[in-house]
Amino acid sequence: MSDATEPRRELPLDPWLLEPMGAAFDEAIESGLTELGLLDSAAAGDIARRTYEAHARLLREWSQAINLTAIREPGEVARRHVIDSLSALPLLSELAHPGATLLDIGSGGGYPGLPLAATLPLSYVGLLDSVGKKARFLDAAGRAVAAVLAEASSDEGESDEAGDSHAVVDIEAIGERAEAATDEHGMREAFDIVISRAVGSLAEVLELSLPLTRVDGTVVAWKREEEGGGLRQELRGAGSIIRAAGGGRPRVVPVEAASLPGHRLVVLAKERPTPPAYPRPAGVRKQRRR
């Protein structure tokens, strides 16, 4: 067995022993927060920035051994991972009540789930990925982010900035397929917010997300509007599964950042319980969409 298949024994767990991400990372974070209008939010505070740094250090190191991301340059990690994740913060800040629960489907490198865990008043964040190596990374990165938040909460001088809601967030890596998590692990209609980024077609994403979302909860999918109206076609193609799985009318929210051209957030409310037949097995889903 190759060395790369043993990340638990050989890959680092402490981000503060690793090389800093550097000025390009910090500058891209600052620029992105400015574009998103978040400089006066918790996302721009020292605590949140420490979580971005800790997470990115581990991502860069682990990506040398396992396929987490092809994006390694610090400024691009900041822009294409951290800032892209935070692009939903203005929207989710209105939806995430104190103590809300969030699930990130296909979390992979921990984006967008971990930046949102550090900036929203959540009680639980689940990072779901069926690939074992990625789930082990998510566990390591989740622990690192949680440690930063816990340390901040114990420091009386920083507790006001961090907020008690951040201090008690439970971050869990879940090494399962979404289909298995829904019923075998008791997660059907368990989450206030279910998110996904770069997972698959919109129809696929919604069939996996809606069964995990509680009634009156919200699904958010990160998408891009390509030339030729690809997103409009995806929305039309997802109509039947939205109706069948209990979703409401989707809306498309443009991301107001010049550094993220064409980025969109597809948002819809869960209006009715999802029938037990959903999500269908992967083979059935693919066959029906041909």
Residue ranges of each PLM-predicted region?
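A general structural signal for well-ordered alpha-helical segments in protein cores
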Residues: 26, 52, 56, 82, ...
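Class I SAM-dependent transferase core
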Residues: 2-98, 133-136, 140-144, 148, ...
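Amphipathic alpha-helical "coupling" segments that flank catalytic cores
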Residues: 1-2, 172
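Conserved SAM-binding loop of SAM-dependent methyltransferases across substrates and taxa
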Residues: 109-122
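S-adenosylmethionine
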Residues: 122-126, 130-290
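Conserved class I S-adenosyl-L-methionine
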Residues: 98-108
